[in-house]
Amino acid sequence: MKNLLVYVNPRNNFSNENWDNENDLLVKVQIDNSIELGWKPEDIMLVTNFPYEYSGVKSIEVGDENYCSFSCGTPTKINVILDLFDKGLIEDDIYWFHDFDAFQMEEFDVDLESNKIALTNYGITNISKGHNGRWSTGSVFFGNRTKDVFDLIKWAVYKYEKNEEVALLALTRHNKHKILDRIDRLNITYNFATRRRNIVEQHKITELPIKVIHFHPFDKRPVFYLREGQDNIGVCLHGKNPMDKPLVTERLAKTFKRHGIA
């Protein structure tokens, strides 16, 4: 399996208008965390549009044209994955793409056919039941025969000028090109997000222990249903949640602390 991280930015570095240079810390957390969990540096694919190297992981550089200028740039991941296909860098293996704020906590091995992608829904939100079933692309597994699936998603992204989650929802709602035959829905354990989620109810449907937790440690907004001040760090690292316990493992918490995130 390959561990895929993507960061393409018009500034050609790890800064952006929301988080300044904090993503430069997160990439180090991601690489250290992955190596601690047994990933070899050569199996960690960090794709950027600028040179970067850390702890034996050297970035694969792609062009600035992969950046998507709308929807906060999130469809960029689709463009980059397709670029990797075009460059012959997607080989006979399973690939795990995940956002910079989706952190693996346990070792896993996903059984997936080479012509399929696998991802979770949104879990149990405090937004609406309609959001619960929406696809979440923050953690996606895919095989080496899925280029046509990503081509379809890209087509829908640019047709509707919406992000890749909305595009995928549009495709699957009407099962265009029988796309549902190419998608496996995973348990929320592979993408346990916290903000705007009913953590207690979501935890009940999670295959424990949580394998991937999805939260941005630098997002200081209150988690939707909690009181002011109970942000992602408080909820996930310090147990300031209705379950009264941390959601991250002690090992991952130590990795965060080593990088000044606590």
Where does each model-flagged region fall?
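Catalytic core and acceptor-binding pocket of nucleotide-sugar-dependent glycosyltransferases
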Residues: 144-255, 259-260
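Conserved catalytic core of nucleotide-sugar-dependent glycosyltransferases
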Residues: 105-170
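Short, polar loop motifs at secondary-structure junctions
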Residues: 46-53, 100-108, 218
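Hydrophobic/aromatic residues located in beta-strands of well-ordered beta-sheets
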Residues: 43-44, 95, 183
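Conserved hydrophobic/aromatic beta-strand scaffold that supports enzyme active sites
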Residues: 80, 117, 139-141, 185, ...
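A structural signal for well-ordered alpha-helical segments within the folded catalytic domains
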Residues: 25-28, 75-79, 162-170
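GT-A fold catalytic core of metal-dependent nucleotide-sugar glycosyltransferases
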Residues: 59-61, 75-126, 134
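N-terminal anchoring/stem segment of glycosyltransferases
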Residues: 1-73, 86-91, 144, 237-244, ...
